Amino acid sequence: MFTAVRATLRPNAVACKRCFSSLSVQLKQAGGGKIMTPKAAIADIPVGAKVMVGGFGLCGVPRTLLDEVVKRPELKDLDVYSNNLGTPGRGVGLLAREGRVRSITGSFLGGNREFGDQFFRGEVQLNLCPQGTFAERIRAGAAGIPAFYTPTGYGTAVHKGELVLKYEKKEGEEAKPVLISKPRESRRFGNRDFILEEAIYGDYALIHARKADEAGNLIFHSTARNFNDPMARNARVTIAEVEEIVPVGSISSDEVHLPSIFVDRIVKAELPLEVEKVCLSKPEGDATELTKRDIIAKRAAAELSDGMYVNLGVGMPNLVPSYLSKDVDVYVHTENGLLGVGPYPSREEDVHTDIINAGKESITERPDAAAFDAVASFDIVRGGHLDVTMLGALQVTANGDLANYMIPGKFATGMGGAMDLVSNPDNTRVIVLTEHVDKTGKPKVVQNTELPLTGVRCVSTIITDLAVFNVDREKGGLTLVELQPGVTLEEVKAKTGADFKVAL
Protein backbone atom coordinates (compact mmCIF):
# COMPACT_ATOMS: atom_id res chain seq x y z
CA MET A 1 0.00 0.00 0.00
CA PHE A 2 1.34 3.39 -0.97
CA THR A 3 0.32 6.52 0.87
CA ALA A 4 1.56 10.07 0.99
CA VAL A 5 0.46 12.99 3.11
CA ARG A 6 0.69 16.18 1.09
CA ALA A 7 -0.54 18.66 3.70
CA THR A 8 -0.43 19.38 7.41
CA LEU A 9 -3.72 18.32 9.01
CA ARG A 10 -5.42 20.86 11.23
CA PRO A 11 -8.20 19.13 13.23
CA ASN A 12 -9.22 22.34 14.99
CA ALA A 13 -9.60 24.46 11.88
CA VAL A 14 -12.64 26.76 11.88
CA ALA A 15 -14.30 28.96 9.29
CA CYS A 16 -13.43 32.63 9.50
CA LYS A 17 -14.55 35.86 7.89
CA ARG A 18 -12.24 37.88 5.71
CA CYS A 19 -11.36 40.81 7.94
CA PHE A 20 -8.43 43.09 8.64
CA SER A 21 -6.83 44.28 11.87
CA SER A 22 -3.50 45.37 13.22
CA LEU A 23 -3.02 41.90 14.73
CA SER A 24 0.23 40.33 13.59
CA VAL A 25 -0.38 36.83 12.18
CA GLN A 26 2.44 34.35 11.73
CA LEU A 27 1.88 31.95 8.84
CA LYS A 28 3.34 28.47 8.95
CA GLN A 29 5.52 27.76 5.95
CA ALA A 30 4.09 24.93 3.84
CA GLY A 31 6.15 21.98 2.77
CA GLY A 32 8.73 21.99 5.54
CA GLY A 33 11.08 19.03 5.65
CA LYS A 34 10.85 18.09 1.97
CA ILE A 35 14.56 18.45 1.26
CA MET A 36 16.55 15.25 1.71
CA THR A 37 19.40 13.19 0.31
CA PRO A 38 18.91 11.09 -2.84
CA LYS A 39 19.37 7.92 -0.81
CA ALA A 40 16.69 8.87 1.71
CA ALA A 41 14.31 10.10 -0.99
CA ILE A 42 14.09 6.76 -2.78
CA ALA A 43 14.51 4.51 0.28
CA ASP A 44 10.85 3.43 0.53
CA ILE A 45 10.28 2.57 -3.15
CA PRO A 46 9.29 -1.11 -2.96
CA VAL A 47 9.82 -3.99 -5.35
CA GLY A 48 7.11 -3.99 -8.02
CA ALA A 49 6.31 -0.28 -7.74
CA LYS A 50 4.83 1.74 -10.61
CA VAL A 51 7.51 4.35 -11.22
CA MET A 52 7.12 7.29 -13.59
CA VAL A 53 10.39 8.72 -14.89
CA GLY A 54 10.41 12.16 -16.48
CA GLY A 55 12.51 13.25 -19.40
CA PHE A 56 12.66 13.01 -23.18
CA GLY A 57 15.60 10.92 -24.32
CA LEU A 58 18.30 12.22 -21.98
CA CYS A 59 16.80 15.72 -21.74
CA GLY A 60 15.36 16.44 -18.29
CA VAL A 61 16.07 12.94 -16.99
CA PRO A 62 16.43 12.66 -13.17
CA ARG A 63 19.91 11.19 -13.50
CA THR A 64 20.86 11.47 -9.82
CA LEU A 65 17.72 9.65 -8.68
CA LEU A 66 18.09 6.89 -11.28
CA ASP A 67 21.68 6.37 -10.18
CA GLU A 68 20.48 6.01 -6.59
CA VAL A 69 17.80 3.48 -7.58
CA VAL A 70 20.45 1.30 -9.21
CA LYS A 71 22.42 1.29 -5.95
CA ARG A 72 19.59 -0.73 -4.38
CA PRO A 73 20.16 -4.22 -5.86
CA GLU A 74 16.95 -5.59 -4.36
CA LEU A 75 14.78 -3.02 -6.15
CA LYS A 76 13.46 -4.99 -9.13
CA ASP A 77 10.31 -5.83 -11.09
CA LEU A 78 9.51 -2.17 -11.59
CA ASP A 79 6.67 -1.11 -13.88
CA VAL A 80 8.24 1.94 -15.48
CA TYR A 81 6.36 4.72 -17.26
CA SER A 82 8.70 6.73 -19.46
CA ASN A 83 8.13 8.18 -22.91
CA ASN A 84 11.61 7.18 -24.07
CA LEU A 85 14.03 4.49 -22.99
CA GLY A 86 17.10 6.67 -23.24
CA THR A 87 20.15 4.91 -24.65
CA PRO A 88 21.94 1.75 -23.48
CA GLY A 89 23.09 2.38 -19.92
CA ARG A 90 21.92 6.02 -19.89
CA GLY A 91 18.66 7.54 -18.74
CA VAL A 92 15.97 4.92 -18.22
CA GLY A 93 18.26 2.62 -20.21
CA LEU A 94 20.29 2.29 -17.01
CA LEU A 95 17.38 0.54 -15.28
CA ALA A 96 16.88 -1.75 -18.27
CA ARG A 97 20.57 -2.67 -18.43
CA GLU A 98 20.58 -3.54 -14.73
CA GLY A 99 17.55 -5.82 -15.13
CA ARG A 100 15.30 -3.78 -12.85
CA VAL A 101 12.37 -3.45 -15.25
CA ARG A 102 9.35 -5.76 -15.46
CA SER A 103 7.44 -3.61 -17.92
CA ILE A 104 7.82 -0.31 -19.76
CA THR A 105 4.95 1.89 -20.91
CA GLY A 106 5.96 4.59 -23.39
CA SER A 107 5.97 5.62 -27.03
CA PHE A 108 9.52 5.28 -28.30
CA LEU A 109 12.43 2.89 -27.79
CA GLY A 110 14.77 5.04 -29.85
CA GLY A 111 18.22 3.57 -30.20
CA ASN A 112 18.03 1.38 -27.09
CA ARG A 113 18.56 -2.00 -28.72
CA GLU A 114 19.52 -3.52 -25.37
CA PHE A 115 15.93 -3.18 -24.23
CA GLY A 116 14.69 -4.31 -27.64
CA ASP A 117 16.71 -7.50 -27.28
CA GLN A 118 15.30 -8.06 -23.78
CA PHE A 119 11.80 -7.61 -25.20
CA PHE A 120 12.28 -10.17 -27.99
CA ARG A 121 13.81 -12.63 -25.51
CA GLY A 122 10.62 -12.42 -23.45
CA GLU A 123 12.33 -10.86 -20.43
CA VAL A 124 10.26 -7.66 -20.29
CA GLN A 125 6.84 -6.39 -21.29
CA LEU A 126 6.53 -3.40 -23.64
CA ASN A 127 3.30 -1.37 -23.69
CA LEU A 128 3.68 0.92 -26.70
CA CYS A 129 1.40 3.94 -26.69
CA PRO A 130 1.20 7.01 -28.96
CA GLN A 131 3.10 9.87 -27.37
CA GLY A 132 0.21 12.29 -27.10
CA THR A 133 -2.07 9.57 -25.77
CA PHE A 134 0.61 8.68 -23.22
CA ALA A 135 0.74 12.31 -22.06
CA GLU A 136 -3.05 12.54 -21.87
CA ARG A 137 -3.35 9.26 -19.95
CA ILE A 138 -0.95 10.68 -17.37
CA ARG A 139 -2.86 13.97 -17.21
CA ALA A 140 -6.19 12.15 -16.88
CA GLY A 141 -4.88 10.10 -13.98
CA ALA A 142 -3.69 13.26 -12.29
CA ALA A 143 -7.07 14.94 -12.78
CA GLY A 144 -9.23 12.06 -11.57
CA ILE A 145 -10.57 11.27 -15.05
CA PRO A 146 -10.68 7.48 -15.59
CA ALA A 147 -10.83 7.47 -19.40
CA PHE A 148 -11.20 9.70 -22.46
CA TYR A 149 -11.85 9.50 -26.20
CA THR A 150 -9.12 10.43 -28.67
CA PRO A 151 -8.84 10.33 -32.48
CA THR A 152 -5.24 9.17 -32.21
CA GLY A 153 -4.72 5.59 -33.32
CA TYR A 154 -8.15 4.98 -34.80
CA GLY A 155 -7.95 2.19 -37.39
CA THR A 156 -4.45 1.15 -36.30
CA ALA A 157 -3.05 -1.76 -34.28
CA VAL A 158 -3.61 0.34 -31.15
CA HIS A 159 -7.34 0.46 -31.88
CA LYS A 160 -7.66 -3.15 -33.07
CA GLY A 161 -5.61 -4.71 -30.28
CA GLU A 162 -2.79 -6.07 -32.43
CA LEU A 163 0.32 -4.89 -30.58
CA VAL A 164 2.56 -7.56 -29.08
CA LEU A 165 3.14 -6.74 -25.41
CA LYS A 166 5.29 -9.72 -24.49
CA TYR A 167 7.01 -12.69 -26.09
CA GLU A 168 7.45 -16.21 -24.78
CA LYS A 169 10.69 -16.62 -22.84
CA LYS A 170 12.74 -19.06 -24.90
CA GLU A 171 16.38 -19.23 -25.93
CA GLY A 172 17.46 -19.87 -29.50
CA GLU A 173 13.97 -20.08 -30.98
CA GLU A 174 11.79 -17.69 -32.92
CA ALA A 175 9.94 -15.48 -30.47
CA LYS A 176 6.23 -16.21 -30.07
CA PRO A 177 3.79 -13.63 -28.66
CA VAL A 178 2.20 -14.57 -25.34
CA LEU A 179 0.44 -11.28 -24.58
CA ILE A 180 -1.39 -9.02 -27.04
CA SER A 181 -2.91 -5.59 -26.43
CA LYS A 182 -6.66 -5.29 -25.90
CA PRO A 183 -8.89 -3.74 -28.59
CA ARG A 184 -10.11 -0.23 -27.80
CA GLU A 185 -13.76 0.71 -27.68
CA SER A 186 -14.61 3.16 -30.47
CA ARG A 187 -17.29 5.79 -30.91
CA ARG A 188 -18.22 8.38 -33.52
CA PHE A 189 -18.68 12.03 -32.57
CA GLY A 190 -19.90 14.26 -35.39
CA ASN A 191 -18.12 13.03 -38.51
CA ARG A 192 -15.00 11.70 -36.77
CA ASP A 193 -14.07 8.43 -35.12
CA PHE A 194 -12.46 8.12 -31.69
CA ILE A 195 -11.14 5.36 -29.43
CA LEU A 196 -11.37 5.07 -25.66
CA GLU A 197 -8.12 5.24 -23.67
CA GLU A 198 -7.82 4.69 -19.93
CA ALA A 199 -5.88 6.82 -17.45
CA ILE A 200 -2.66 5.56 -15.91
CA TYR A 201 -1.46 6.07 -12.36
CA GLY A 202 1.98 6.07 -10.78
CA ASP A 203 3.06 5.17 -7.27
CA TYR A 204 6.22 7.27 -7.53
CA ALA A 205 7.41 9.93 -9.96
CA LEU A 206 11.11 10.68 -10.38
CA ILE A 207 11.41 14.04 -12.09
CA HIS A 208 13.94 16.76 -12.89
CA ALA A 209 13.45 20.53 -12.60
CA ARG A 210 15.60 23.63 -12.96
CA LYS A 211 14.72 25.26 -9.65
CA ALA A 212 12.72 24.61 -6.47
CA ASP A 213 11.98 26.69 -3.43
CA GLU A 214 12.03 24.99 -0.03
CA ALA A 215 8.24 24.54 -0.15
CA GLY A 216 8.46 22.55 -3.39
CA ASN A 217 7.30 25.05 -6.00
CA LEU A 218 9.12 24.17 -9.22
CA ILE A 219 10.41 25.92 -12.32
CA PHE A 220 11.39 23.91 -15.40
CA HIS A 221 13.58 25.04 -18.27
CA SER A 222 12.71 24.86 -21.97
CA THR A 223 12.22 21.35 -23.41
CA ALA A 224 13.42 19.73 -20.17
CA ARG A 225 9.87 20.28 -18.88
CA ASN A 226 8.44 17.59 -21.21
CA PHE A 227 6.92 14.74 -19.14
CA ASN A 228 8.34 15.91 -15.82
CA ASP A 229 5.45 18.27 -15.15
CA PRO A 230 2.47 15.94 -15.83
CA MET A 231 4.13 12.98 -14.11
CA ALA A 232 4.71 15.03 -10.97
CA ARG A 233 0.98 15.82 -10.85
CA ASN A 234 0.05 12.17 -11.29
CA ALA A 235 2.05 10.09 -8.82
CA ARG A 236 1.19 9.45 -5.18
CA VAL A 237 4.76 10.36 -4.22
CA THR A 238 6.72 12.81 -6.34
CA ILE A 239 10.48 13.14 -5.87
CA ALA A 240 11.94 16.20 -7.59
CA GLU A 241 15.61 16.33 -8.45
CA VAL A 242 16.49 20.00 -8.95
CA GLU A 243 19.54 21.96 -10.02
CA GLU A 244 18.96 24.80 -7.57
CA ILE A 245 17.11 25.13 -4.25
CA VAL A 246 16.16 28.63 -3.14
CA PRO A 247 14.40 30.04 -0.03
CA VAL A 248 10.64 30.48 0.04
CA GLY A 249 9.77 33.85 -1.47
CA SER A 250 12.51 33.68 -4.10
CA ILE A 251 10.06 32.46 -6.74
CA SER A 252 7.07 34.65 -7.51
CA SER A 253 3.68 32.92 -7.74
CA ASP A 254 3.46 33.87 -11.43
CA GLU A 255 6.73 32.07 -12.15
CA VAL A 256 5.73 28.73 -10.65
CA HIS A 257 5.25 25.98 -13.24
CA LEU A 258 4.37 23.23 -10.76
CA PRO A 259 2.80 24.09 -7.36
CA SER A 260 4.27 22.62 -4.20
CA ILE A 261 1.18 20.50 -3.49
CA PHE A 262 2.41 18.05 -6.14
CA VAL A 263 5.94 17.71 -4.74
CA ASP A 264 6.68 15.48 -1.74
CA ARG A 265 10.48 15.32 -1.69
CA ILE A 266 13.26 17.52 -3.04
CA VAL A 267 16.77 16.37 -3.91
CA LYS A 268 19.73 18.42 -5.12
CA ALA A 269 20.97 17.14 -8.48
CA GLU A 270 24.49 15.75 -8.22
CA LEU A 271 25.10 14.48 -11.75
CA PRO A 272 25.20 16.69 -14.87
CA LEU A 273 22.68 16.25 -17.66
CA GLU A 274 23.74 15.07 -21.11
CA VAL A 275 22.89 15.78 -24.73
CA GLU A 276 22.09 12.68 -26.75
CA LYS A 277 22.98 14.16 -30.15
CA VAL A 278 25.17 17.26 -30.50
CA CYS A 279 24.36 18.86 -33.87
CA LEU A 280 26.00 22.07 -35.10
CA SER A 281 24.98 24.27 -38.02
CA LYS A 282 27.06 24.16 -41.18
CA PRO A 283 29.00 27.31 -42.08
CA GLU A 284 27.42 29.37 -44.85
CA GLY A 285 28.87 28.51 -48.21
CA ASP A 286 29.60 24.93 -47.16
CA ALA A 287 27.85 23.57 -50.24
CA THR A 288 27.81 19.88 -51.08
CA GLU A 289 26.14 17.88 -53.85
CA LEU A 290 22.45 17.36 -53.18
CA THR A 291 21.52 13.87 -52.01
CA LYS A 292 18.11 12.29 -52.59
CA ARG A 293 17.13 13.44 -49.12
CA ASP A 294 18.16 17.00 -49.93
CA ILE A 295 16.19 16.95 -53.20
CA ILE A 296 13.06 15.88 -51.32
CA ALA A 297 13.56 18.41 -48.51
CA LYS A 298 14.19 21.25 -50.97
CA ARG A 299 10.95 20.49 -52.83
CA ALA A 300 9.04 20.12 -49.55
CA ALA A 301 10.14 23.61 -48.49
CA ALA A 302 8.07 25.02 -51.36
CA GLU A 303 4.90 23.74 -49.64
CA LEU A 304 5.37 26.12 -46.71
CA SER A 305 4.18 29.73 -46.62
CA ASP A 306 5.19 32.66 -44.47
CA GLY A 307 3.70 32.57 -40.97
CA MET A 308 2.75 28.88 -40.95
CA TYR A 309 2.93 26.75 -37.82
CA VAL A 310 4.49 23.41 -38.76
CA ASN A 311 5.79 20.21 -37.23
CA LEU A 312 8.74 18.55 -38.91
CA GLY A 313 9.21 14.89 -38.09
CA VAL A 314 12.45 13.16 -37.24
CA GLY A 315 14.91 12.61 -40.09
CA MET A 316 14.32 14.01 -43.57
CA PRO A 317 11.69 16.61 -42.56
CA ASN A 318 14.27 18.22 -40.26
CA LEU A 319 16.24 19.22 -43.37
CA VAL A 320 13.38 21.35 -44.74
CA PRO A 321 14.18 24.65 -42.91
CA SER A 322 17.59 24.74 -44.62
CA TYR A 323 15.82 25.21 -47.97
CA LEU A 324 13.24 27.85 -47.05
CA SER A 325 13.49 31.07 -49.04
CA LYS A 326 14.51 34.14 -47.07
CA ASP A 327 11.03 35.68 -47.35
CA VAL A 328 9.36 32.65 -45.72
CA ASP A 329 9.38 32.54 -41.93
CA VAL A 330 7.64 29.56 -40.31
CA TYR A 331 7.18 28.59 -36.67
CA VAL A 332 8.45 25.07 -36.12
CA HIS A 333 6.82 23.01 -33.38
CA THR A 334 8.58 20.07 -31.77
CA GLU A 335 6.45 17.60 -29.82
CA ASN A 336 8.77 17.48 -26.82
CA GLY A 337 7.57 20.96 -25.91
CA LEU A 338 8.73 23.94 -27.97
CA LEU A 339 7.12 26.28 -30.49
CA GLY A 340 9.74 28.37 -32.25
CA VAL A 341 12.61 26.00 -32.98
CA GLY A 342 15.73 27.82 -34.10
CA PRO A 343 18.73 26.55 -36.08
CA TYR A 344 21.36 24.19 -34.79
CA PRO A 345 23.92 25.90 -32.51
CA SER A 346 26.94 27.25 -34.38
CA ARG A 347 29.44 26.29 -31.65
CA GLU A 348 29.67 23.49 -29.10
CA GLU A 349 29.75 26.01 -26.27
CA ASP A 350 26.26 27.14 -27.35
CA VAL A 351 24.79 23.63 -26.91
CA HIS A 352 22.37 23.42 -23.98
CA THR A 353 21.26 20.12 -22.46
CA ASP A 354 17.71 21.46 -21.96
CA ILE A 355 17.10 22.56 -25.56
CA ILE A 356 16.57 19.75 -28.07
CA ASN A 357 14.18 18.74 -30.83
CA ALA A 358 12.12 15.56 -31.16
CA GLY A 359 15.12 13.80 -32.70
CA LYS A 360 17.09 14.49 -29.47
CA GLU A 361 19.34 16.88 -31.41
CA SER A 362 20.76 20.08 -29.93
CA ILE A 363 18.92 23.16 -31.22
CA THR A 364 18.46 26.83 -30.40
CA GLU A 365 15.27 28.78 -29.67
CA ARG A 366 13.87 31.66 -31.67
CA PRO A 367 13.56 34.94 -29.74
CA ASP A 368 9.76 34.53 -29.83
CA ALA A 369 9.76 30.85 -28.82
CA ALA A 370 7.48 29.34 -26.18
CA ALA A 371 8.18 26.20 -24.13
CA PHE A 372 5.56 23.97 -22.50
CA ASP A 373 5.00 20.45 -21.22
CA ALA A 374 4.06 17.34 -23.20
CA VAL A 375 0.34 17.70 -22.46
CA ALA A 376 0.17 21.23 -23.89
CA SER A 377 2.30 20.17 -26.83
CA PHE A 378 -0.17 17.51 -27.89
CA ASP A 379 -3.12 19.81 -27.28
CA ILE A 380 -1.59 21.80 -30.15
CA VAL A 381 -1.16 18.66 -32.25
CA ARG A 382 -4.41 16.80 -31.62
CA GLY A 383 -6.46 19.98 -31.68
CA GLY A 384 -5.46 20.70 -35.27
CA HIS A 385 -3.72 23.98 -34.49
CA LEU A 386 -0.74 23.23 -36.74
CA ASP A 387 -1.00 24.12 -40.42
CA VAL A 388 1.25 21.36 -41.71
CA THR A 389 3.07 18.29 -40.45
CA MET A 390 5.77 16.54 -42.47
CA LEU A 391 6.67 12.90 -41.80
CA GLY A 392 8.73 10.10 -43.26
CA ALA A 393 7.28 6.77 -44.38
CA LEU A 394 7.97 3.08 -44.76
CA GLN A 395 5.00 2.91 -47.11
CA VAL A 396 2.13 5.21 -48.07
CA THR A 397 -0.96 4.08 -49.96
CA ALA A 398 -3.12 5.45 -52.74
CA ASN A 399 -5.88 6.41 -50.29
CA GLY A 400 -3.52 8.18 -47.88
CA ASP A 401 -2.87 5.44 -45.32
CA LEU A 402 0.54 5.89 -43.69
CA ALA A 403 2.85 3.23 -42.23
CA ASN A 404 6.04 4.60 -40.73
CA TYR A 405 6.86 3.04 -37.36
CA MET A 406 7.13 -0.76 -37.52
CA ILE A 407 8.07 -3.71 -39.70
CA PRO A 408 6.67 -6.83 -37.99
CA GLY A 409 9.35 -9.21 -36.71
CA LYS A 410 12.06 -6.57 -36.80
CA PHE A 411 13.29 -4.10 -34.19
CA ALA A 412 10.56 -1.52 -33.64
CA THR A 413 11.43 1.89 -32.28
CA GLY A 414 7.79 2.76 -31.58
CA MET A 415 5.32 5.24 -33.01
CA GLY A 416 6.43 8.24 -30.96
CA GLY A 417 4.18 11.20 -31.74
CA ALA A 418 3.44 10.24 -35.35
CA MET A 419 -0.04 8.80 -34.70
CA ASP A 420 -1.01 12.02 -32.95
CA LEU A 421 0.45 14.19 -35.70
CA VAL A 422 -1.79 12.55 -38.33
CA SER A 423 -4.92 12.36 -36.13
CA ASN A 424 -6.55 15.58 -37.38
CA PRO A 425 -5.81 15.70 -41.14
CA ASP A 426 -8.80 17.91 -41.95
CA ASN A 427 -7.17 20.75 -40.03
CA THR A 428 -3.47 19.85 -40.21
CA ARG A 429 -2.25 18.94 -43.69
CA VAL A 430 -0.07 15.82 -43.66
CA ILE A 431 2.81 15.74 -46.16
CA VAL A 432 4.94 12.60 -46.51
CA LEU A 433 8.60 12.88 -47.49
CA THR A 434 10.09 9.60 -48.66
CA GLU A 435 12.44 8.08 -51.19
CA HIS A 436 10.41 6.53 -53.99
CA VAL A 437 11.76 3.00 -53.46
CA ASP A 438 13.34 1.24 -50.49
CA LYS A 439 16.88 -0.17 -50.28
CA THR A 440 15.83 -3.30 -52.16
CA GLY A 441 14.16 -1.34 -54.97
CA LYS A 442 10.59 -2.03 -53.86
CA PRO A 443 8.06 0.81 -54.21
CA LYS A 444 7.18 2.78 -51.09
CA VAL A 445 4.14 4.36 -52.76
CA VAL A 446 1.73 1.42 -52.98
CA GLN A 447 -1.92 0.59 -53.62
CA ASN A 448 -2.32 -1.09 -50.22
CA THR A 449 0.02 -1.97 -47.36
CA GLU A 450 0.22 -4.84 -44.91
CA LEU A 451 2.49 -2.90 -42.56
CA PRO A 452 1.02 -1.64 -39.26
CA LEU A 453 -0.65 1.70 -39.91
CA THR A 454 0.25 5.01 -38.33
CA GLY A 455 -2.91 6.64 -39.63
CA VAL A 456 -5.86 5.97 -41.94
CA ARG A 457 -6.64 8.26 -44.91
CA CYS A 458 -4.48 10.97 -43.43
CA VAL A 459 -1.90 11.90 -46.10
CA SER A 460 -2.66 14.74 -48.53
CA THR A 461 0.65 15.06 -50.41
CA ILE A 462 3.57 12.71 -51.14
CA ILE A 463 6.97 14.12 -52.10
CA THR A 464 9.68 11.71 -53.27
CA ASP A 465 13.03 12.01 -55.04
CA LEU A 466 11.17 11.29 -58.30
CA ALA A 467 7.79 13.00 -58.09
CA VAL A 468 5.02 14.79 -56.22
CA PHE A 469 1.57 13.22 -55.78
CA ASN A 470 -1.66 14.65 -54.45
CA VAL A 471 -3.88 12.19 -52.57
CA ASP A 472 -7.68 12.12 -52.68
CA ARG A 473 -8.30 11.18 -49.05
CA GLU A 474 -12.07 11.03 -49.44
CA LYS A 475 -12.44 8.93 -52.60
CA GLY A 476 -8.97 7.40 -52.71
CA GLY A 477 -6.48 7.71 -55.54
CA LEU A 478 -3.26 9.46 -56.51
CA THR A 479 -2.61 12.25 -58.98
CA LEU A 480 0.92 12.87 -60.25
CA VAL A 481 1.33 16.65 -60.31
CA GLU A 482 5.08 17.12 -60.69
CA LEU A 483 8.26 15.33 -61.75
CA GLN A 484 11.59 16.04 -60.12
CA PRO A 485 14.22 17.50 -62.51
CA GLY A 486 15.57 14.88 -64.91
CA VAL A 487 12.91 12.28 -64.07
CA THR A 488 10.63 10.78 -66.73
CA LEU A 489 7.02 9.67 -66.47
CA GLU A 490 8.06 6.16 -67.51
CA GLU A 491 10.48 5.90 -64.58
CA VAL A 492 7.78 6.97 -62.11
CA LYS A 493 5.33 4.43 -63.54
CA ALA A 494 7.92 1.67 -63.28
CA LYS A 495 8.77 2.45 -59.66
CA THR A 496 5.30 3.17 -58.25
CA GLY A 497 3.25 0.35 -56.74
CA ALA A 498 -0.09 2.08 -57.25
CA ASP A 499 -2.23 3.41 -60.08
CA PHE A 500 -2.29 7.17 -60.51
CA LYS A 501 -3.72 9.91 -62.69
CA VAL A 502 -1.42 12.38 -64.43
CA ALA A 503 -1.87 16.17 -64.24
CA LEU A 504 1.53 17.58 -65.18
Briefly describe each language-model feature range.
Residues 22-31, 198, 297, 301-304, ...:
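N-terminal/domain-start segments enriched in small and hydrophobic, helix-friendly residues
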Residues 78-83, 331-335:
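Beta-strand segments within the central parallel beta-sheet cores of soluble alpha/beta enzyme folds
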Residues 20, 29-36, 42, 57-71, ...:
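Conserved phosphate- and dinucleotide-binding cores of soluble alpha/beta proteins
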Residues 51-52, 59-71, 297, 303-305, ...:
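N-terminal low-complexity or amphipathic/hydrophobic leaders
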Residues 40-50, 138, 303-308:
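Glycine-rich phosphate/diphosphate-binding loops that line cofactor/substrate pockets in enzymes
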